[in-house]
Amino acid sequence: MSKKIKAGIVGATGYTGVELLRLLAAHPDVEVAAVTSRSEAGTAVADYFPSLRGVYGLAFQTPDEAGLEQCDIVFFATPNGIAMKDAPRLLEQGVRVIDLSADFRIRDIPTWEHWYGMTHAAPGLVSQAVYGLSELNREAVAQARLVANPGCYPTCVSLPLVPLLRQCRLKPGMPLIADCKSGVSGAGRKGNVGSLLCEAGDNFKAYGTAGHRHLPEIRQTIAGLQDGIAEGFVFTPHLAPMIRGMHATVYLHLSDGSDPETVLRDYYRDSPFMDILPAGSTPETRSVRGANLCRISIRQAAQSDVWVVLSVIDNLVKGAAGQAVQNMNIMFGLEETHGLDAIPLLP
């Protein structure tokens, strides 16, 4: 592009915010023009995040002072409840918005209010938002003014299911079980006893067993692709003693005669961030660390009619900031891979 895209980031002091800063710094077509934080206003970005020394000369500003309305696109890396209040003004001024919180993901307002425990401040915008699971909604994202970036668990679980659901390959009335594990960074950067090293290190536990906020988001995607499946969906998240990474093990029943590996390969043939592994392989979280990738394998369980899907992503990249940049690329007609060609870190 001859003119760089001017981007703003609202709420850039969390892990998702710094990941956006890292990825956008390497993007050839983007200039980060505004970075906001109410609590850190006046602090240099490079002082707050030493990993960005020599990369950014910006300082955090309050949202009112940052000139966000002068940006071409604004990313909200904020807690739930912020974007729905602040995004409408930017949209009215012609700024495109990608919201990495959950404010615009769930179309049924009462359902959203039940799970997030607050009244929605912009219910009229929810129907206008495009759900930004890039590999599912490319065409809609390309035309969007407002993108609801998916959650990390919904991304990891939905990507291996989308091709199968689109062809109605799952058996209705049968259980669909997602057993998921996340690194501690998925809980965010705020102080939390459960995220302390002495609590999360050398430990493994389930949480949200009575119901997790990502459950209705995943069910919404499933229900939109194949009837009779969402009702049998069960989702249990676990906290693993690692910083980054997400692993989903999904148990499902397929219609007779299905060849799921071929279905997945055909659907994702032209998707640069999707990797369908050879038969017998098992994806590892470290194989996607720091990269905007989803690696998937599928096999039939021994002596059973149950199929087992394994899916891994980096929860901060493909599960958050990387997918947001991918959506931005689609919105502005760029190659999806621009700024997202980093090779996973190993070890």
From Swiss-Prot:
Catalytic activity: N-acetyl-L-glutamate 5-semialdehyde + phosphate + NADP(+) = N-acetyl-L-glutamyl 5-phosphate + NADPH + H(+)
InterPro entries: AGPR_AS, AGPR_type-1, NAD(P)-bd_dom_sf, NAGSA_dehydrogenase, Semialdehyde_DH_NAD-bd
Enzyme class: oxidoreductase
BP GO annotations: L-arginine biosynthetic process
Coiled-coil stretches noted in the UniProt entry, renumbered to this chain: none
Annotated keywords: Amino-acid biosynthesis, Arginine biosynthesis, Cytoplasm, NADP, Oxidoreductase
Entry annotation: catalytic residues: C152
Location (main, coarse): cytoplasm
GO molecular function, one term: NAD binding
Localization: Cytoplasm
SMART domains assigned: Semialdhyde_dh
GO cellular component labels: cytoplasm
Enzyme Commission numbers on file: 1.2.1.38
Pathway: Amino-acid biosynthesis; L-arginine biosynthesis; N(2)-acetyl-L-ornithine from L-glutamate: step 3/4
Pfam families with a match to the protein in the record: Semialdhyde_dh, Semialdhyde_dhC_1
Domain of life: Bacteria
Function: Catalyzes the NADPH-dependent reduction of N-acetyl-5-glutamyl phosphate to yield N-acetyl-L-glutamate 5-semialdehyde.
Family: Belongs to the NAGSA dehydrogenase family. Type 1 subfamily.
Identification of the protein by name: N-acetyl-gamma-glutamyl-phosphate reductase
Organism from which the protein derives: Neisseria gonorrhoeae (strain ATCC 700825 / FA 1090)
